[in-house]
Amino acid sequence: MSIHIQQVNKHFGNFVAVDSVNLEIKTGELTALLGPSGSGKTTLLRIIAGLEQADSGIVKFNGEDITTQHVSERGVGFVFQHYALFKHMTVFENVAYGLTVRPRKTRPSKAEIAEKVHSLLKLVQLDWTADRYPSQLSGGQRQRIALARALAVEPKVLLLDEPFGALDAKVRAELRRWLRRLHDEINVTTVFVTHDQEEALEVADKIVVMNKGRIEQQGTPEEVYDTPSNPFVYEFLGNVNLFHARVKHGHSTIGNIHIPSPEHAGGEEQQGLAYVRPHEIEVLTQPTENAIKVNLDLVTIVGPVARLEVLTEIDEQLIHVELSKVQFKQLGISKGDNAWIQPRYSKVFLGEGI
């Protein structure tokens, strides 16, 4: 089931929640709506579901205009952040609920419902919980049951609103990998909302970055992370260092160092901001012509990763550097020592006020 959104707008009073959004989601695609709070991602998801009506614009499923269609007629499955399981029902009864409340003409037999429920419980690897109640399950298990319940009605589209937001970090990481494998198996067009950059990068086929009701960029995780279209996307997708830069003849100059900048090949010098991610900086223990002298101010070891905070000698600008713990140990430096840093890559955005 493909989804096509054309010039969709939604206001709540004077607040612009969704602003002229155009988006196409292919059949079987797993798409992440990623953005900070208030960016419009959940409102857009609810418009797709039919839980909110757009002020203007068109929503199509497989080319059919369903903009004014009631949520019950759209064939969507919805999973919320807080499970929404019925506490007084067993797991089996929760998963079966959407089938048992169908009109008699379209309702499967009890045997067919039982077969479907047990099949779904096996799919989410919880077939042994059929007779238990939600209170007897962990948060991660409850969310998987909520997903099984959404799948029971064989939705054309699966919509997930921050499905792992209420879970601890380890369970979230496990469920992300599980959701990716599950999607590859069932191949239902899926849209999920998240503010977690790592979650979107790990799980999605396509990421749609939203801010202030608009789409800032959309593309594969690799495209969005490696080639951000603007400063907002660059800063939102992970830590970044900012340097004032001068750009001319395909090179950017940061202080006393020069970095290739082939996207800016013009002959006239321009000012801009150079964005450099912490892992794109090399640390040296000896001075070199094309490096910045720094002092090591803080070292934080997080498992296999070493995170450094260094201060530049000239203006004491704080710079974040990330490398493996093994690489850091090999450098043989510690807090208070001098070192030299060399950005391997930078992305320069030109213009005043950037």
Swiss-Prot record:
Part of the ABC transporter complex CysAWTP involved in sulfate/thiosulfate import. Responsible for energy coupling to the transport system. One of its GO terms (cellular component) is ATP-binding cassette (ABC) transporter complex. It is found in: Cell inner membrane. Keywords: ATP-binding, Cell inner membrane, Cell membrane, Membrane, Nucleotide-binding, Sulfate transport, Translocase, Transport. The complex is composed of two ATP-binding proteins (CysA), two transmembrane proteins (CysT and CysW) and a solute-binding protein (CysP). The keyword ATP-binding applies. Its main location: membrane. This is Sulfate/thiosulfate import ATP-binding protein CysA 2. Residues 3-237 form the ABC transporter domain. Pfam families: ABC_tran (PF00005), CysA_C_terminal (PF17850), TOBE_3 (PF12857). The keyword Plastid does not apply. One of its GO terms (molecular function) is ABC-type sulfate transporter activity. It is a peripheral membrane protein. It catalyses: sulfate(out) + ATP + H2O = sulfate(in) + ADP + phosphate + H(+); thiosulfate(out) + ATP + H2O = thiosulfate(in) + ADP + phosphate + H(+). Its EC number is 7.3.2.3.
